[in-house]
């Protein structure tokens, strides 16, 4: 094929870019292979969005952690593939996203999704102008997952009139109060599963069947009642019991549930952590504290952990079987933020006041404070902060004894 001018070449390149982006937009997002009650909720949301109508709708999905907001948003996104010129699922991979640097990072991420040829911005106001420009060009679906504060919405979504007619914006959050009425014109509370739905989900993960056998039915019902209707708790606790066929083991697990605070998600998750061996626990804590939110591949984590003398392959397989981590089709590793928070709380409890006495540090301010003071006990194993690095994978610094080093 002969291209006769620079203008023609530029046009062809633009067409190719648009074709590639359309293919990427049509790639389904990873959703749990087994879900319960999802279809009826999607139908309710489709009615709320009314995608065939003009106008701009902003829908806020709110609910407690672990209730399935992200899963629902991803499934809805997959349902709407092909209905918009551009489809964006924005994961909030900056844990606080309150500093200008974090907000600019998220702005660039959104801009790049919609218009990859646009140059990067370097300050918030420029980002706002760039976002207004790109979202006004085409009918888009934007899903903002796990929004923590109003400021994030102000610099990423702003106002409805920024967007082209027919656009839809979906926001997920644990906190209903971060959804301002002047921006959001539809609200949907994601509620816990009904008891029959919860029993079905628990049974799948514990027994790989839709309904418990008579032998396990009574124990299963008691466990579901104590666990509550949170899909995350049901999945993790059910996976904890998978391939445990002795009634005595189930009764022991039931007693553990009875000893924790009623329907407390973190306590339920920790039962699964307590069931790991020592090395598996260490690897779980490494992943929770150091590698999550870094867009990291499974092989990279395995290489890093093997470098520290761990039999990482077996441990990662066990963590995956327990539903404590997930490995997606692109081989990226993912951990639910509630599970991550449980792991980090274990490390924080090692020394609530003095971060230098903890086994792992991940907060950049705490890292700098400890390094400046040059006071780290020998058991501090790793320091890492993804905010310090611009690359997708950062190397953990293994610490032997800072008292013997000049930092």
What are these model-derived regions, one by one?
Residues 2-67, 71-86, 91-93, 102, ...:
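N-terminal flanking helix/linker immediately upstream of nucleotide/cofactor-binding cores
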């Amino acid at each position: 094929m002969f291209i006769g001018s620079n203008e023609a070449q530029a046009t062809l390149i633009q067409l190719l870019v648009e074709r590639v982006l359309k293919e990427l937009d049509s790639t389904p997002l990873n959703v749990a292979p087994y879900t319960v009650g999802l279809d009826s909720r999607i139908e309710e949301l489709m009615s709320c969005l009314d995608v065939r109508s003009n106008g701009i709708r902003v829908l806020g999905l709110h609910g407690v952690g672990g209730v399935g907001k992200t899963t629902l948003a991803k499934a809805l996104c997959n349902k709407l593939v092909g209905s918009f010129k551009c489809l964006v699922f924005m994961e909030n991979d900056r844990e606080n996203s309150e500093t200008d640097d974090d907000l600019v990072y998220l702005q660039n991420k959104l801009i790049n999704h919609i218009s990859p040829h646009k140059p990067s911005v370097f300050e918030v106001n420029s980002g706002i102008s760039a976002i207004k420009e790109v979202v006004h060009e085409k009918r888009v679906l934007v899903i903002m997952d796990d929004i923590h504060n109003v400021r994030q919405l102000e610099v990423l979504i702003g106002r409805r009139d920024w967007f082209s007619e027919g656009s839809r914006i979906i926001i997920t959050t644990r906190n209903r109060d971060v959804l301002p009425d002047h921006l959001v014109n539809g609200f949907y509370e994601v509620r816990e599963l009904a008891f029959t739905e919860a029993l079905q989900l628990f049974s799948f993960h514990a027994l790989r069947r839709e309904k418990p056998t008579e032998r396990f039915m009574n124990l299963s019902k008691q466990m579901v009642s104590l666990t509550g209707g949170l899909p995350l708790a049901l999945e993790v606790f059910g996976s904890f019991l998978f391939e445990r066929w002795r009634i005595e083991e189930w009764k022991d697990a039931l007693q553990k549930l009875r000893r924790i605070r009623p329907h407390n998600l973190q306590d339920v998750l920790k039962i699964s952590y307590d069931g790991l061996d020592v090395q598996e626990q260490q690897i779980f804590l490494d992943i929770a504290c150091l590698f999550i939110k870094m867009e990291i591949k499974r092989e990279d984590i395995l290489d890093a952990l093997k470098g520290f003398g761990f039999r990482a392959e077996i441990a990662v397989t066990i963590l995956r079987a327990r539903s404590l981590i997930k490995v997606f089709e692109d081989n990226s590793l993912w951990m639910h933020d509630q599970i991550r928070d449980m792991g980090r709380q274990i490390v924080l409890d090692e020394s609530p006041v003095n971060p230098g006495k903890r086994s792992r540090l991940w907060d950049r301010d705490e890292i700098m404070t400890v390094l400046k003071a040059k006071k780290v006990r020998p058991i501090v194993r790793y320091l890492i902060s993804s905010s310090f690095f611009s690359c997708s994978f950062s190397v953990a610094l293994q610490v032997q004894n800072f008292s013997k080093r000049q930092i």
